[in-house]
Structure formats: structure tokens, C-alpha cells
UniProtKB/Swiss-Prot annotation:
<keyword id="KW-0664">Pyridoxine biosynthesis</keyword>
<feature type="binding site">
    <location>
        <position position="175"/>
    </location>
    <ligand>
        <name>NAD(+)</name>
    </ligand>
</feature>
<dbReference type="GO" id="GO:0033711">
    <property type="term" value="F:4-phosphoerythronate dehydrogenase activity"/>
</dbReference>
<feature type="active site" description="Proton donor">
    <location>
        <position position="255"/>
    </location>
</feature>
<protein>
    <recommendedName>
        <fullName>Erythronate-4-phosphate dehydrogenase</fullName>
        <ecNumber>1.1.1.290</ecNumber>
    </recommendedName>
</protein>
<comment type="function">
    <text>Catalyzes the oxidation of erythronate-4-phosphate to 3-hydroxy-2-oxo-4-phosphonooxybutanoate.</text>
</comment>
<dbReference type="InterPro" id="IPR029752">
    <property type="entry name" value="D-isomer_DH_CS1"/>
</dbReference>
<dbReference type="GO" id="GO:0046983">
    <property type="term" value="F:protein dimerization activity"/>
</dbReference>
<feature type="binding site">
    <location>
        <position position="66"/>
    </location>
    <ligand>
        <name>substrate</name>
    </ligand>
</feature>
<dbReference type="GO" id="GO:0016618">
    <property type="term" value="F:hydroxypyruvate reductase [NAD(P)H] activity"/>
</dbReference>
<dbReference type="Pfam" id="PF02826">
    <property type="entry name" value="2-Hacid_dh_C"/>
</dbReference>
<dbReference type="Pfam" id="PF00389">
    <property type="entry name" value="2-Hacid_dh"/>
</dbReference>
<dbReference type="InterPro" id="IPR020921">
    <property type="entry name" value="Erythronate-4-P_DHase"/>
</dbReference>
<keyword id="KW-0520">NAD</keyword>
<dbReference type="GO" id="GO:0030267">
    <property type="term" value="F:glyoxylate reductase (NADPH) activity"/>
</dbReference>
<dbReference type="InterPro" id="IPR006139">
    <property type="entry name" value="D-isomer_2_OHA_DH_cat_dom"/>
</dbReference>
<dbReference type="InterPro" id="IPR006140">
    <property type="entry name" value="D-isomer_DH_NAD-bd"/>
</dbReference>
Length: 376
């Protein structure tokens, strides 16, 4: 089997070479001519997989190591008899910890307490649901908005978007990008909705897809003095994002919210397992076999873990401000945005840190937040 794999998938050769001959390539450089002779294609979100890319090729299996599939024409793949697999939820932990770290950063910067703010979660799939659980574990009030989920789920009280934006202090977006239908999300956050935000300061976080927010309308609102702190990990027209918008947001990063090492390996192994099943050569790999020891493995903490202590623990693992600085320094360089993603550090998840505490309440809370905590 010949397998073409995006170079941003960690351990790609080590993982997929068990199933065939592997060729590594930049995801944006995959063309119909290049892919035509391969049996399988393994991609991330920067590669649009559709009829124009694959028609007439030998490809019989497509895997995306991402949780979203708006870059995949899965209907055409099914019609063409091409097996498709993706890694739903593989990066949920990473995105949730990015958002939590962002909130801890802003609470420090602007002098508020998270438990005094209400977080509106827009989109309650794998990521939104996990964020809801972790915020609740820390005692942060939440509101939920997801019309499709509201019809089938009972995890909480559901709000209409128009009501949520007037009541929540924080709006964090976790929807897929869809252009059609009753619940289309393209430009979900638009000029009208931004105008409807209360005059008191609000926070907007987008880690799903850039076009869920109308970037032009957002920039216009910020330039007009809208009291809005903005954290953007995703942008319209990536990698050619609006420099004016970047200059007006609190934190900007290069579409790396889901880029934990655990999340990327989790996604790759999900596709590996599915492809091996497709080939009838059943093999199974575990994430832990590919993870190196973290830089900091264990800390001891005395007493109750409050917001300041949680912030210190989160900062031990991930420095969000550094990613913001890197984007601002490199965005003017040729291919700067993509280079940041290609050469991204081995960011770890909170579960990589063991925390010994002498307080049972702290131990339980830290475990609910994703750390490994033991009572000592």
C-alpha cells in the first residue's frame, strides 16, 4: 500500500509505515497529480478533499486526523466508494485546556474572578460538552446554546443564541462550519449580533472555524470601541489572516488550539486503527506508547486550589502568551502562519502533570479538571 500523509501529523512515518510505504508532504501541497498513484490519503484540516482532488486516483481510503470535516466532501467520497474516517473528539481536551488557560490569562490581566463570570458555550459537541463539565467542576456558571443538540440532549438548560449573548460574559465558539440549513454557522457571529452585545465588557473566543465569525464585522466593531476582549485561534482566509484584526485582538494564535501532542497522536492512531481494519490487517496502537516524558512530571501543592493556584499549574504546562507573541512576530514572513503550525512545540495536556495535594477537595477538583492528582 502507498500512503500519502500530512507532515504535521506526529510520528506519521512510525505509525503508518506498519501498513505500507509512507510519503510525507505538506498538507497545502497535495494536488490531484501527486495523490493519483496512492492507495490512501491521511490529512489534516488544511487539505480540501473532494472530487477535483481524487477523481481518477487510486485512493480507496481517506483519513482526517481532525475532529472537524468541513474540508472533506464526505458525500462524494461515499458515492465514489472511498472509505472515509475521521478522529471526532481527538483534540477536545487540547481545545478545552486552551480556552480555560485563555480565561485564566484574561482574569489575571483584567482583574476578575472566573467564578464571577458566566460562560456561554455555543456549540456543545465533543469540545463544548467537555468545556461545560470542566467549568462546572471549577464552579464557573455556564449557559449552553446548540439548537441541534437541544433536540436530543438533556445535559443542561438550553438558551437561544440571541438570549445567550445578552446574558453571558464570555462567548466561546465550538461549532462546525456549515453554510446551509436551518442551523448554518457561517458568520454566526455577525454585525447584528455584535451590535446586540451589552455595553459592558464581554469576551469572545473562537477556536472552531474562522468563518463562524464575520472577521470584517468584528474588526469594525472593535475599531468603533466595542468593549470586547477577543481571543482568536482561527481566522477567515487562513493562512492570509487580517493583520488589522490581529492588531486589535487580545490574543491571536495560528490555529493551534487543538495542537497538543496527545491530541495529535490520538487522532493519528484513530485513523491508523480504522485503516488497518479497512485493510483487514487488524492492528491496534495506544497513545501512551508514543508520548515522551513531560518536562515537568510532578508537583506537590499545599491547601485548597483556588484560581491563582490553578493558573500557576496551567502555566507550568502551556504558555498561551508565547504562542500569541510567535504569531505577531512571524505573520509577516513568507509562509509564517503555516510554519508556526508545522514547527509547533510538543505541547502537553494537563493529564501529563501529576499533582500531590494534602487536601481532598483539591484532589477531587484537579482530577475533574484533567490533572492527575493524588492525596498525600
Amino acid at each position: 500500500m502507498k500512503i500519502l500523509v500530512d507532515e504535521n501529523i506526529p510520528y506519521a512515518h512510525k505509525i503508518f509505515s506498519r501498513l505500507g510505504d509512507v510519503q510525507i508532504i505538506h498538507g497545502r501541497k497535495i494536488t490531484a497529480q501527486i495523490v493519483s498513484s496512492y492507495d490512501a490519503l491521511i490529512v489534516r484540516s488544511v487539505t480540501n478533499v473532494n472530487q477535483s482532488l481524487l477523481e481518477g486516483s487510486k485512493v480507496r481510503f481517506v483519513g482526517s486526523t481532525t475532529s472537524g470535516i468541513d474540508h472533506i466532501d464526505d458525500h462524494w467520497l461515499e458515492k465514489s466508494g472511498i472509505k472515509f474516517s475521521y478522529a471526532a473528539g481527538c483534540n477536545a481536551i487540547a481545545v478545552v485546556e486552551y480556552v480555560f488557560t485563555a480565561l485564566l490569562l484574561l482574569s489575571q490581566r483584567y482583574g476578575f474572578h472566573l467564578r464571577d463570570k458566566t460562560v456561554g458555550i455555543i456549540g456543545v459537541g465533543n469540545i463544548g460538552r467537555l468545556l461545560y463539565q470542566r467549568l462546572n467542576a471549577f464552579g464557573v456558571p455556564t449557559l449552553l446554546c446548540d439548537p441541534p443538540q437541544a433536540e436530543i440532549s438533556t445535559i443542561g438548560e438550553w438558551q437561544l443564541l440571541e438570549k445567550l449573548v445578552t446574558e453571558a460574559d464570555v462567548l466561546t465558539l465550538h461549532t462546525p462550519l456549515t453554510y446551509h440549513g436551518r442551523h448554518a454557522t457561517w458568520h454566526l457571529i455577525n454585525e447584528d449580533l455584535l451590535s446586540a452585545l451589552p455595553s459592558t465588557k464581554r469576551i469572545l473566543i473562537n477556536t472552531c472555524r474562522g468563518a463562524v465569525v464575520d472577521n470584517v464585522a468584528l474588526l469594525h466593531a472593535l475599531k468603533k470601541g466595542k468593549l470586547l476582549s477577543v481571543i482568536l485561534d482561527v481566522w477567515e482566509k487562513e493562512p492570509n489572516l487580517s493583520l488589522s484584526l490581529l492588531n486589535n485582538v487580545d490574543i491571536g494564535t495560528a490555529h493551534i488550539a487543538g495542537y497538543s501532542l496527545e491530541g495529535k497522536v490520538r487522532g493519528a492512531i484513530k485513523i491508523f486503527n480504522d485503516y488497518s481494519k479497512f485493510l483487514g490487517a487488524i492492528q491496534s496502537l495506544n497513545v501512551s506508547a508514543f508520548l515522551p516524558a513531560p518536562m515537568i512530571e510532578y508537583v506537590r501543592w499545599h491547601g485548597v486550589i483556588n484560581e491563582e493556584e490553578l493558573r500557576k499549574l496551567a502555566y507550568l504546562i502551556y504558555d498561551l502568551q508565547f504562542d500569541d507573541i510567535l504569531l505577531r512576530r512571524n505573520i509577516h514572513k513568507p509562509h509564517g502562519f503555516d510554519q508556526l503550525r508545522t514547527n509547533y512545540c510538543e505541547r502537553r495536556e494537563w493529564s501529563s502533570l501529576s499533582v500531590g495535594t494534602d487536601n481532598n477537595i483539591s484532589t477531587n477538583m484537579l482530577n475533574q479538571l484533567g490533572f492527575k492528582s493524588i492525596l498525600i
